[in-house]
């Protein structure tokens, strides 16, 4: 009898590293998770220690196998999914980072972005990389590191330094420095990659003065990139066979592989992606054109809207405001009041993402009167997640010409029934919540499993996808539009708050 085989997905997120073991029926067998430190050197700056990312991720891998009581030779393949855009530069020789990882949320490169705009590069960047000029993406972060770490640019030119997003860093560590790769989805988030030619963009490298020698090789999202030797029982060499940025992995995990299918992930931020097939749709409404995974991990395109603060705004209620002791409490308190009593919370703590793209917006609470209590503020914070999602969906429908009939949802916050119902109410659209919540890990597992023949094709996976609950709109159109217009007014007042030259 042959031993039962499994797939392991490594899900390296913004606040924690996770490892998930899945069986052939796409059931979750075991999960391990470790949080790691968020470093805030200055207001608006966010960093991670790359060695801590690696330590937390590698320990979850060992832990999850022990929990599931399986040996490494029972693993058919490993898939990796990761927080995107976060930039790491390290020494080829030692594997030691020359600076902390600059996280996607970090706004320190706003000045570099302003310079790119002044130099008239916005259209070039949008047309060729699919992105808008914003500190969010990796390119300006790499430039910042090379500008600020003495001698680093010369070392990079000599091939002594390497750049990677988190997937690249993990694979480098897992293969003891033998493999320096990324996939198309992660490359498409750097602002250095031409999404039409599917190669690094020479003009962008030139503009940001980033030596090509430090960049990884770019490959498909579903293929064998290299082998890793896991300790634990057996010490077998296991193929690393899938890579996708977290949002593209979630899109694949939701099996949104046909044109016009969309999902929204509610994590630290909120990310809506709509598959546009083999056509790169240029957005006229502040969305990104990005690379997604087709049915067998090949290049498809997608429209994406990124909201920076979703789950993070609930953490703010918990950690900074001390209004709740646990994120799960937010639903309980939000339903203690019948509405927000006219309050809107705009959680623009690090600026606003799609479709506004204003790095100078700041968080604000509007509509406060004497009768407002903490429950109203908690409810308004939850509602802000749904309003921001509607902002993105309206832009997406305008760009694609596709009217969405159902939105597939995933991520931590989808367990909040109040939020999901309000989301359906404010969109006027069905919201579908899947049985398996770990769709980001699922996507990485699917990509890896398909690459090694663990699963034959998507048809085999389709029957495993079960919708656990469907939410339908429960308010009238006039009420929906009235509430949304209040949100739009609040957003306008929060914009352009911070001074540019500070």
Swiss-Prot record:
CDD domains: FGGY_EcGK_like. Its EC number is 2.7.1.30. SUPFAM superfamilies: Actin-like ATPase domain. GO terms for biological process: glycerol catabolic process; glycerol metabolic process; glycerol-3-phosphate metabolic process. Glycerol binds at residues 84-85, 136, 246-247. Activity of this regulatory enzyme is affected by several metabolites. Allosterically and non-competitively inhibited by fructose 1,6-bisphosphate (FBP) and unphosphorylated phosphocarrier protein EIIA-Glc (III-Glc), an integral component of the bacterial phosphotransferase (PTS) system. ATP binds at residues 14-16, 268, 311, 315, 412. It comes from the Bacteria. Homotetramer and homodimer (in equilibrium). Heterodimer with EIIA-Glc. Binds 1 zinc ion per glycerol kinase EIIA-Glc dimer. The zinc ion is important for dimerization. NCBIfam families: glycerol_kin, PRK00047.1. This is Glycerol kinase. It comes from Salmonella arizonae (strain ATCC BAA-731 / CDC346-86 / RSK2980).
